[in-house]
């Protein structure tokens, strides 16, 4: 089975859950994806927050982006400035990217996708749009015979939850 060496940056709520799932249930990824994920380095601004995972932890996030063994960088730190530097450095170093960072994709997506294209790497960002609904996969794979030039809509989890609550009888009753 093929093995992919991964670096994870960010161990907050999302990053911590990702590390926990990869550590506690690796067989799910192996069985569903046909690949073994080896987390070889973790970048955590507060190093102690990642100690419970018994992994190679650094507080210097760019060390993960510059680690020649890391093949895929999972960016889960949030925000724009540091995340952009981290992703750009990783792409320039030939690493594929996975991110759940809505702000990063909304603000710098076009330039990051162009940089990724130049360096022949992929950016996975499905978790950063539409509240995790697999809309990107549907557009890329399900509509492959169609030419989609532009797509607009309110596609985020917060708005979806808000609209759901507005339609509930308990909210609308007087």
Where are these regions (language model features)?
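N-terminal glycine-/serine-/threonine-rich beta1-alpha1-beta2 phosphate-ribose binding loop
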Residues: 1-93
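Short, ordered loop/turn segments at secondary-structure junctions
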Residues: 45-47, 102-103, 110, 128-130, ...
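Short catalytic-loop micro-motif centered on adjacent basic/acidic residues
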Residues: 74-75, 97-100, 123-126, 150
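Aromatic/hydrophobic pocket-lining residues that form π-stacking "cages" and hydrophobic walls in ligand
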Residues: 86, 112, 164
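ADP-ribose/adenylate-binding Rossmann-like module
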Residues: 91-107
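Rossmann-fold NAD(P)-binding glycine/threonine-rich loop
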Residues: 102-123
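Rossmann-like NAD(P)H-binding beta-loop-alpha module
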Residues: 124-166
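Single conserved hydrophobic/aromatic residue that forms the stacking wall/gate
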Residues: 165-174
């Amino acid at each position: 089975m093929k093995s992919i060496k991964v670096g994870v940056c960010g161990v907050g709520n999302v990053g911590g859950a990702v590390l926990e799932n990869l550590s506690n249930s690796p067989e799910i990824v192996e069985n569903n994806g046909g690949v073994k994920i080896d987390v070889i380095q973790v970048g955590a601004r507060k190093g102690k927050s990642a100690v419970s995972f018994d992994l190679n932890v650094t507080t210097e996030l760019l060390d993960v982006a510059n680690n020649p063994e890391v093949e895929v960088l999972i960016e889960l730190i949030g925000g724009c400035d540091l995340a952009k530097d981290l992703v750009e450095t990783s792409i320039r170093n030939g690493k594929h990217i996975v991110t759940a960072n809505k702000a990063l994709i909304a603000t710098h997506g076009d330039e990051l996708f162009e940089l990724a294209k130049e360096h022949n790497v992929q950016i996975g960002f499905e978790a950063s749009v539409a509240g995790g609904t697999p809309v990107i996969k549907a557009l890329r794979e399900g509509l492959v015979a169609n030419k989609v030039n532009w797509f607009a809509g309110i596609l985020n989890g917060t708005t979806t939850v808000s609209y759901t609550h507005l339609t509930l009888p308990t909210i609308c009753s007087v």
